[in-house]
């Protein structure tokens, strides 16, 4: 009899403990769901494998964490790639991709939207604000080469007003050319090469306006920038300037087309260039060195992402984006490719290696 009573009490105790565990689990799930109710959307202008996009995305998550917002715990994140550099390249296609992103915003109802590069700013953020002026979804942009105050919803860089702020992208050309001069002291001329994409046109225009027309102490004489449409034209120009320049400046190379009109994969462009040109290359984005060019000094995607992520955290905390000035955060990275330097029989100076943010040992990228 006594053992029966003991057994019954033991079963009751186990039942109570199990019930408590269930309640605790449900509370934990509920709390987790409640804490991650915030929804964030990131819209990239280009494709998923574009190195800049990957760096920006990682930086955003890091920047938000520095403001106390942890992915999955405090917010859910969704990403949309417009893919306007390789796949959807006509004006009509770019606009259609913008509409898809806007539809996603309507369905997802994010608390904050990050838009990366000029297409996403124009065709998503600005288009959304102009179409739905009474909504207050905040937008934070990055990778913007033009002056965003040309758009009506942005009053000025100092006081944007409305629901939009972000980071300008201003390439540090002078620093990049100085790096080239440091590595190859005898160099006096650099030829700049670019593909025909709209983003390249922005970069070329900005370079002429902000560098050629204003800088009087350039460490190198500039040839170009030269924009070419096809891979064959790229090859011809590269060979033409083997004796006319001392350095090759890499702006862009992702929309060169073959005889059939198809985009030539970037690794193919890099591979041909490094095996047929004797000009040391200086790129303007870190992943140019990762792909195989000798050196790069440019705006850091990761650090830019951290910057706008911190801005995003500030906005989630209650600050109006319209009160946050739009600036160039002036965050750069230096990168080298040692295999390419070895091919050119160039020794990267120790003081430059010390300053490098990343050094790649081999030619070739895993980002495509």
Predicted regions and their residues:
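Short hydrophobic alpha-helices and adjacent helix-cap/hinge residues
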Residues: 2-10, 28-368
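Bacterial N-terminal signal peptides
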Residues: 15-27
């Amino acid at each position: 009899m006594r053992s029966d009573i003991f057994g019954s009490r033991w079963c009751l105790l186990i039942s109570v403990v199990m019930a408590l565990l269930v309640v605790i689990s449900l509370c934990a799930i509920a709390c987790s769901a409640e804490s991650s109710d915030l929804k964030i959307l990131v819209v990239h202008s280009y494709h998923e494998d574009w190195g800049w996009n990957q760096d920006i995305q990682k930086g955003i998550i890091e920047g938000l964490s520095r403001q106390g917002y942890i992915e999955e715990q405090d917010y859910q994140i969704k990403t949309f790639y417009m893919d306007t550099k390789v796949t959807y390249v006509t004006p009509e296609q770019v606009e259609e991709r913008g509409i898809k992103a806007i539809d996603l915003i309507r369905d997802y109802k994010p608390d904050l939207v990050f838009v990366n590069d000029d297409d996403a700013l124009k065709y998503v953020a600005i288009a959304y604000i102009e179409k739905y002026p009474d909504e207050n979804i905040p937008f934070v942009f990055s990778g913007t080469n033009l002056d965003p105050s040309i758009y009506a919803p942005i009053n000025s860089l100092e006081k944007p007003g409305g629901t939009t702020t972000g980071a300008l992208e201003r390439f540090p050309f002078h620093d990049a050319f100085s790096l080239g001069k440091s590595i190859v002291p005898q160099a006096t001329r650099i030829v700049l090469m670019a593909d025909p994409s709209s983003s390249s046109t922005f970069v070329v225009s900005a370079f002429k306006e902000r560098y050629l027309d204003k800088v009087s102490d350039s460490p190198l004489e500039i040839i170009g920038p030269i924009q070419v449409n096809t891979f064959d034209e790229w090859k011809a120009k590269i060979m033409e300037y083997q004796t006319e320049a001392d350095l090759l400046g890499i702006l862009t190379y992702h929309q060169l087309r073959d005889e059939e009109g198809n985009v030539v994969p970037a690794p193919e462009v890099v591979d041909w260039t490094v095996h047929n040109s004797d000009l040391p290359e200086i790129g303007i984005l870190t992943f140019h060195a990762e792909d195989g060019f000798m050196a790069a000094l440019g705006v850091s995607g990761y650090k830019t992402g951290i910057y706008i992520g911190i801005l995003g955290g500030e906005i989630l905390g209650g600050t109006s984006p319209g009160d946050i000035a739009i600036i160039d955060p002036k965050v750069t990275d230096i990168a080298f490719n040692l295999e390419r330097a070895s091919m050119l029989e160039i020794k990267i100076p120790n003081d430059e290696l010390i300053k490098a943010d990343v050094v790649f040992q081999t030619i070739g990228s895993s980002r495509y």
